[in-house]
Amino acid sequence: MEVLKTGTTTVGITAGDYVIMGTDSRATMENFISNKNAQKLYQIDNYAAMTIAGLVGDAQVLVRYMKAEMELYRVQRKVSMPIDAAATLLSNMLNQTKFYPYMVQLLVGGYDTKPHIFSIDAAGGSVEDIYASTGSGSPFVYGVLEAEYQKNMSLDDGINLVIKAISAAKQRDSASGNMLQLGVVDPKKGFYYLSEDEILSRLKKLKLQL
């Protein structure tokens, strides 16, 4: 079984009306790097995304579940599911299986009438904040965020901050590494991924190594 455990770095922040989410791309099995291009950031609706840390199979099942539930909600009601409702749905599901838990740590982020970031644990505990991080690299991420985060920072500054935070974790956490994955929830355009070229360009401008 391929295991991410918490050996990863994920982060989500709000920046004005935007939500920015990012991860590293290293998957580990104990001390072995099993995959250098593991997807950990998923779009789950037009204006919502989710990051994963934990058992790959458990996390992927939950991603598929949330995609299906949010699409069904949108088809039936002609509107997108509110982000707090999505977080509640996911946390309730996890709580119902807490004695046989999904071994995951999740971030759910998105925009409805305002930006949201929720951190959700394996027992279904759900906490909303202006920024959040999961995985073994999270202590290093929080160090950067607490020093440099500003609530109404621009989208450009927010993207750069997420890159800096993940890069800091990669430098100190051996279970985090390789390429970064970043996405933005735009209140007008919806969710989109940043291209690898743009991420590399920003790393160069920030004088950070991949």
Swiss-Prot record:
Its main location: cytoplasm. Component of the proteasome core, a large protease complex with broad specificity involved in protein degradation. SUPFAM superfamilies: N-terminal nucleophile aminohydrolases (Ntn hydrolases). It comes from Picrophilus torridus (strain ATCC 700027 / DSM 9790 / JCM 10055 / NBRC 100828 / KAW 2/3). Coiled coil: none annotated. It catalyses: Cleavage of peptide bonds with very broad specificity. This is Proteasome subunit beta. Keywords: Autocatalytic cleavage, Cytoplasm, Hydrolase, Protease, Proteasome, Threonine protease, Zymogen. The 20S proteasome core is composed of 14 alpha and 14 beta subunits that assemble into four stacked heptameric rings, resulting in a barrel-shaped structure. The two inner rings, each composed of seven catalytic beta subunits, are sandwiched by two outer rings, each composed of seven alpha subunits. The catalytic chamber with the active sites is on the inside of the barrel. Has a gated structure, the ends of the cylinder being occluded by the N-termini of the alpha-subunits. Is capped at one or both ends by the proteasome regulatory ATPase, PAN. GO terms for biological process: proteasomal protein catabolic process. HAMAP family: Proteasome_B_A (MF_02113_A). It is an enzyme of class 3 (hydrolase). It comes from the Archaea.
